[in-house]
Amino acid sequence: HVAHWNNSRKIAFTLAEVLITLGIIGVVAALTIPTLMANHRRQVAETRLEKFYSTINQAVKMAEVDYGDMTQWEPRENKYEKDENGNDDKTKELPNTEYWQKYFLSYMKTLKVEPYGHNTSCLLAYLPDGSVVNFANGSIQFYPSAKDFKFLVDEDTGKIKNNMENSGVKYFTFLFYPSGTQDANKYHYKKGVEPYKYGWDGTKEGLLNSNSIGCKKQVSNERAYCAALIQMNGWKIPKDYPLRF
C-alpha cells in the first residue's frame, strides 16, 4: 500500500481579517483616488490648452489670408441693446458675434456657437474635444472642460460676471490685441491670441506676484496670468503651481 500525502493547505480568512483587509483597501483608495483625479484634470488642462492655442492661432493665420494683416482688421466694437428711444443702453452689453465669427469662428471647427443668456457680452463656442471658449468683448476665456463653465450674477447690478475662484484652474484667460502700441501691450503687439500678458514685466515673478491678476490664491481681480505661467513651462503645469486642481 502506497500512502498519498496531501500537502495542500486550506486557507481560510476570518470575518475580522476580511474586514481589516477591506478597510486597508478603502484607506488606500481614499488617499490615491483624489490624487489620480487631480492628475487627470491637470493632464486634460495641459493638452487642451496647448491644442486651443495652436487651433485659434491657425484660425488667425487663415483669416489673414482673407482679410490682410491682423493689425489692420476692423476694430472690435462693443454692442448694446437699444432702449425705447433707439439709443444704446450701456447697461445691456451684447456679444459682438459678427467680429468673432468673421475672424475666428469661420476658421475653427465647433459643435455649437451661442450667446450666453441675456444681458451679457459672452459668446460661447463649444469645441469637439469637450472644451468651450468664451469670447467676451474684453478678453477670451478658455475652459478645458465645458462642464466647468459657470458664471455668477452680481447681486448689486444683476450683471453676469466671471467666477473668479475658478480662474487659473477651471478657466484660463487669453487676449487678442495685436494693434495696441502702448508699452503695457508689448507681449500682444503684432501677435495672435496669447495667454493674457497685458502689463507683464517679463519675469516669472511678475506672473506670480501681481496682486490684481497674478497666478496666486489671493487676487483682487481674476488670475489672468496663469495661462502665461503654464505656457512659459512648455504648456505643462509647473510642479510648484500655486493652485490646486
Residue ranges: model-predicted function:
Residues 8-41:
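N-terminal single-pass transmembrane signal-anchor helix
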Residues 35-56, 60:
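Aliphatic-rich helix starts adjacent to a transmembrane/signal segment
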Residues 57-76:
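Alpha-helix exit/C-cap motif
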Residues 60, 81, 108-112:
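Amphipathic alpha-helical interaction segments
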Residues 72-77, 82, 86:
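Juxtamembrane "stalk/linker" segments
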Residues 87-245:
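Intrinsically disordered, low-complexity regions enriched in Pro/Ser/Thr/Gly and acidic residues
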